[in-house]
Amino acid sequence: MFDWIHGNSRLPIALSIVELLVDMDCKGCEKKVRRAISKLDGVDTVEIDVDRQKVTVTGYVDREEVLKMVKRTGRTAEYWPFPYNGYYGDYYTYPSQHLEQSDQKIYQTISYSGKYDFYDVDDFQNTNNSTINGYYPSSSQKVQPNIDENALHLFSDDNAHACTIM
């Protein structure tokens, strides 16, 4: 583990937390994965949650070595694909909650007012202070298009003289 003391050029590995998503079905799978990870040098703790398919390894280990060792057990494994925030701990109990939360954030930042605003392409202004960067027309520059009233009623079902192609 501390080869750098004996003249090896490798730098020491810092204390790290490695989170993996591992396909485990039973206690036997859990035991096999725990035993394989425990054989690695520098592992302090191994926490396995079979319900969430999550393995958390704490210690002075390289995350690539941990992933390789878990894959050698025959289980499919990948890095935990959901965010970890140390302040909240395991904020997302299950992976599907992360997806639901991210969808809600998108819907909260993009609001729909219920009416369509018409504007000219040349009248955009740059607003970099919004949560979604892009070009938005200012409220004074919005223009209603010129649409003939007869053209709107041409294909109406209420009009007896309407186009009969449809």
From Swiss-Prot:
Domain HMA residues, every copy: 15-78
Database matches in InterPro entries: Heavy-metal-associated_CS, HMA_dom, HMA_dom_sf
Binding residues annotated for a metal cation, in chain numbering: C26, C29
Residue numbers carrying Cysteine methyl ester: C163
Statement: the UniProt record of this protein carries the keyword Cell wall biogenesis/degradation: no
Name of this protein: Heavy metal-associated isoprenylated plant protein 45
Propeptide stretch(es), residue numbers: 164-166
Native source organism of the sequence: Arabidopsis thaliana (Mouse-ear cress)
Primary role: Heavy-metal-binding protein.
Assigned keywords, A-Z: Lipoprotein, Metal-binding, Methylation, Prenylation
GO molecular function: metal ion binding
Similarity annotation: Belongs to the HIPP family.
Record carries keyword Metal-binding: yes
Lipid sites, type S-farnesyl cysteine: C163
Organism lineage string: Eukaryota, Viridiplantae, Streptophyta, Embryophyta, Tracheophyta
